[in-house]
């Protein structure tokens, strides 16, 4: 049986080992060293203890990525409380529901969230703490009020001759099955569930990253945190892995627009990049593809002798756009556009596509860029098993199942959902459909809930149709829905490009109809679109930038 060490002991060891190293920077702001983080953790432990927080109590966090968020999260775990990270992009009503459902005792909030929420809607909370300076937004107990008012005094009394590394001693989880955090799903299917992740899941994800990716990372290497830390993809691979490895994490404390991200890449020059497809696709489509459409470039790319050299030069330029210092870019969280992937593969760009789920904290599949099979999402990750429920897994898609220490304990207060997701043998049923080749590479076809049934009984995977549609002229993104036995394409045009081209609304409509005809010309009869509709606004998305499909299929 696998021996799993204490995760909190790893946090403690990393702090002691890297005491004077830079670890957390708010981009264009403050930088904390490990000893600064340790002091903040200790102060929060004193606050928790003196305000009556018990081991196992729930502490929620909701705010943009920041060093203060990271310290509050680490303090929660190492105190023995259960963290409840909440995506700051959730609506106030969603935040109230999660805080109330999780039985949270305290809530840490960022500056924006603090102005949007109403404490009366969360009656069981004992207090709301302001993340930037840990001041109290709300206190419902005298103990909490007193503890915060006298926090510096109590810290000084406990450590009269300065706080040193020998003082660092954290709560160690009693067993790997102990609950570490509850992470509420992004709500892609319209219903958010509380995923209970044990310490073994945090350890297993961190051990995978340190073992497989960590051999290319050195102490002091830099990483930019782009994804929300309240999402397990960002939490595991842009924060916890790096913190345990002695790396330096930069937080984009503002909304990470493409311009801000591009500037941060140039300034920080990260060693590893974790991204959702949308970020990569926007940079490639806006910064790279237009340069390849000139007559000169088209001519050069069609000359076999020169083609290789041109692709190498293009690869250099694309690599430079991402800082020029990374070992590889790991893409995950949503489907990757095939046109963009084909381009990156052709120029020899160092990328790979992984696969995961909140319920696995998150990793399920991964392959290093050097062994990555194009179009796949890699093989079963370290510590995990993966199988396809299909009579012919190589050719007939079936549900993807996974088993291993990453898998959740269950859904908080939802035994029915837990039984539906985890079978008696411990396999987690992902709800995703895919195939697996002889080498173990997994190819995702779509969500089983999204699969459409054609009039002739043929299975239709809308994600595959959308990938093709989104590569057509002037289409920024798309969703395919079914009305009766008809398929309809909802297309959101690239209005920026249309403006540059001087197109009128009627021109855009004509182009979209032409796209439909061109699409149908190369598709089998059961997958053809009977109509297209223009979606004026961008499709609403989850924080990991996958479209909330359920909003458009009703």
Report the location of each language-model feature.
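Conserved ATP-binding/catalytic segment of the ANL
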Residues: 380, 394-395, 399-454
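Conserved pre-ATP/AMP-binding loop-to-beta segment of ANL
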Residues: 148-184, 191, 216-222
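Conserved AMP-binding/adenylate-forming
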Residues: 30, 46-90, 226
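Conserved C-terminal "lid"/linker of ANL adenylate-forming enzymes
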Residues: 452, 477, 485, 516-554
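Conserved AMP-binding/adenylation subdomain of ANL enzymes
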Residues: 203-222, 232-316, 325, 350
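AMP-dependent adenylate-forming
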Residues: 10-33, 189
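Structural core segment of the AMP-binding/adenylate-forming
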Residues: 10, 51, 78-157, 485
